[in-house]
Each structure stands twice: as C-alpha cells, then as structure tokens.
Design a protein with these regions (language model features):
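Core beta-strand elements of the Rossmann-like FAD/NAD(P) dinucleotide-binding domain
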Residues: 6, 144-153
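Glycine-rich FAD pyrophosphate-binding loop
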Residues: 25-46
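Active-site-adjacent segment of FAD-dependent monooxygenases/related oxidoreductases
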Residues: 45, 49-115
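Conserved FAD-binding catalytic core of PHBH/FMO-like flavoproteins
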Residues: 114, 153, 157-265
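A conserved short coil-to-beta-strand element within the FAD-binding core of flavoproteins
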Residues: 125-139
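FAD/FMN-dependent oxidoreductases across multiple families
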Residues: 233-298, 315-321
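C-terminal helical "tail/cap" subdomain of flavin- and related membrane-associated enzymes
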Residues: 309-387
Length: 387
C-alpha cells in the first residue's frame, strides 16, 4: 500500500522514469514509481548516450557516475557496401563529452535505481496501472497490486505502448516505417574492428550498423530488414546475422550472441495537451527510428527538464503554470527536431534502388569532404543544444 498522498507518481521504471523520479525527489517532491515488470532489465537494450544528454546530466552528478560504466566511441565511418564514403570525428564537438558513451541499459537502470532509493523514492514492481482519474487537484491511480495512489501529478514513462497515454485518450500521431529492424549483441573476432568507431554501411540489402560495446570483443549490430522479418526472429541467430552482415560488407567471426531483438519502428508524437496533470515523457511521448540511438537521449532530456519545471508548477498551482507550459513547448520542439533528423537519415540509409543510393552516396561524400559538413553531422549525433 501507498499510505499517503504523493506529489508525483511516475509510471515506468526504465531509465527515463527512474531519472525523472530521482531528480524530482532530489528537488524536494514526494515520488513513487509504479512498474508493471517484476524486475529490472538484464539486457543491454538502449546503449547510446550522446554529448548533449551527458551535459544535461552533469549538474546532478549522473554523467560522472555513468562514465566508468561505458565505452567512448569518438568517430563515425560511413560506407556504401565495401566502399568507404568517409567519416567524421566527434572529438571536435564543443562539449566536455565529445563522444558517444555506450552503456548497457541494465547498468544505467541499476545506477538510477540505486540513486533513486537513496533519494527516498520507492519503486513498486509487478504493479500494472489499470485506471487514472483526474480532477482539478490531482490524479488517482489504480493498479492491480496497490490500493489507490493519490498524486498531484502523474508522469507517464511507460514506453511506446504507453498504458497511461491510452487511458488519457491522447492521440499518438505518425507513421510506421516499412520493414523491420534487428539488434544483436555479438562477441566477434575481427582484428580490423576499431573499438572507438561506429560503422554505418548502406547497400541494396539494407542498412548495417556496427557499434563497439562496453566489453572488448563485443559489438552491437543493427540490421534493417526491408522485408520485415519480425515473426521469424529476423535473420536468426549468430550464423544468420554473420551471413547477413557479410553480405552487406562486414565480415567477422561471430562467436556468441548474448541478446537479439527484432521489431518494427515508428515515427510518432503525442498530441499536445496543456490541461492535463498526466505528463508524457520518453517513448510514451515520442518514438523515432533507431538510427543514431536518439530515443533514449530524447527521453532523458525530457526527464531532466521536467525535474527543473515541475517543482515550481507544484508550488504555484496546476497544469496551466507558465513554466510548465514552456517545458511542454521546449520538449515538443526538441522531439520534432529529433524525429525530423532521424526520419531523414532513415529514408537515406534504407534506399534500395541503385540510382537513389548513388545520389545518396554522392551527397554523403560531399558532406564529409568539408569541415562544415563533418561538424554538422557530428552535431546531429550529439543532439540539440538547450534552448
């Protein structure tokens, strides 16, 4: 049971929900977290943390805590099949964190859960929300494991298939991309694999991305599957993944597959609603293509900025608070920018016809031959600067 009213009920104990809960608790609000899963994730899942996100996490000390948990990737190489188009260095970014930090999601969640507990946040697992009833003063949340939870605000961080978004009746507009995606964490033998570089390979069979992971000899492989092989588990296990990667231009001996996931992806954005005490963040508010690993970063920036805006709105009154309205506008602008950039990249890197790919390759080569082009690409990976 949750015996007393709370300021904030966060629904979802992934990295976005836990970071919001932690930072809101540190700001002096009473926070509980409701999570339908029985335990934390044990897989790597979302791994990439970009420069602007780490900058946003710096004042809380979280960036410094995350650094030892990950590996720094400081350059991106772009290929058309086995032909190199060029590359760009992230080390030239004007940031204290001029790289991609790859941290397994299980490690990120573990750190955030421990810090949230120290801040007084209680996480209720195996607790699926069934209803939310909102009135002028707050929200009553009912679940299948607790009695009613009364909160002044509910933060929905329960993912792309958000129960809270559905219960609130909020439209989730956008489109589903053709084909499917397969992610796999592989132990590989490839002497040419640079642990500080990510490789993007475009070709007639689809996109291949190879990203070094936090452990030596391990790589995250991303495959776009134009024919949408979701039901059959994509191209299969280690042998199938290795064969498909080789057909796209990367040959390595795959020794082990620790985790793989096949899914469809979408470009969607929740409709704005400034009257509600149910606040959507992370994938509950927006989903984008996996190209560039931007989804987790966008959600973490949602959480950090909400923790700055919500305490004042709580003190002053309600959903119409000017600071909270400004937060909504800023987050929507950030999301629209990320969705536009990832959509452009997805369309460009999943082209299948030879003439279209030739045009893309010419444009990419041209951009990579100039310092301004390389800087623009690095900034697009790093994420938007705070307004």
């Amino acid at each position: 049971m949750v015996g007393d009213d709370v300021d904030v009920a966060v629904v979802g104990a992934g990295p976005v929900g836990l970071s919001a809960a932690l930072l809101l608790a540190r700001a002096g609000l009473g926070v509980v977290v409701l999570e339908r899963r029985p335990g934390p994730v044990t897989e790597s899942r979302a791994t990439d943390l970009h420069a602007r996100t780490l900058e946003a996490l710096t004042p809380s000390g979280l960036a410094e805590s995350l650094l030892p948990l990950g590996r720094r990737v400081d350059a991106v190489e772009m290929w058309s099949g086995r032909r190199r188009l060029g590359g760009f260095d992230l080390a030239r970014l004007r940031s204290p964190y001029p790289y991609i930090l790859t941290v397994p999601q299980c490690a990120t969640e573990g750190l955030l859960a421990a810090e949230a507990e120290r801040a007084g946040v209680r996480v209720h697992r195996s607790t699926a929300v069934r209803s939310v009833d909102e009135d002028a003063d707050g929200v009553t949340v009912r679940s299948d494991a607790l009695g009613p939870v009364r909160a002044r605000w509910v933060v929905a961080a329960d993912g792309a298939s958000s129960t809270l978004r559905a219960l609130a009746g909020t439209a989730f507009r956008g489109r589903t991309y053709a084909g499917a995606w397969q992610l796999a964490d592989l132990r590989v033998e490839d002497p040419s694999l640079d642990p500080a570089r990510v490789h993007m390979v475009g070709g007639p069979r689809g996109l291949l991305v190879v990203l070094p992971m936090h452990l030596d000899g391990w790589a995250r492989v991303v495959l776009h599957l134009p024919h949408g092989q979701v039901a059959g588990g994509g191209v299969g296990g280690p042998e199938g993944i290795a064969a498909e990667a080789a057909a796209r231009g990367w040959t390595a001996a795959v020794r082990e597959c620790r985790w793989t996931s096949t899914f469809r992806t979408h470009r969607r954005l929740a409709a704005p609603d400034g009257r509600r005490r149910v606040l959507l963040i992370g994938d509950a508010a927006h989903v984008c293509s996996p190209i560039g690993g931007q989804g987790l970063n966008l959600g973490l920036r949602d959480a950090v900025s909400l923790a700055a805006a919500l305490p004042a709105a709580t003190a002053r009154g309600g959903p119409a608070d000017a600071g909270l309205a400004a937060w909504r506008r800023a987050r929507r602008a950030d999301a629209l920018g990320v969705l536009a950039r990832t959509d452009l990249a997805t369309r460009a890197w999943t082209l299948r016809s030879a003439p279209a790919r030739a045009v893309r390759d010419t444009a990419v080569r041209g951009a990579l031959t100039t310092a301004a082009g390389r800087r623009l690409l690095a900034e697009s990976v790093a994420g938007p600067r705070p307004a």
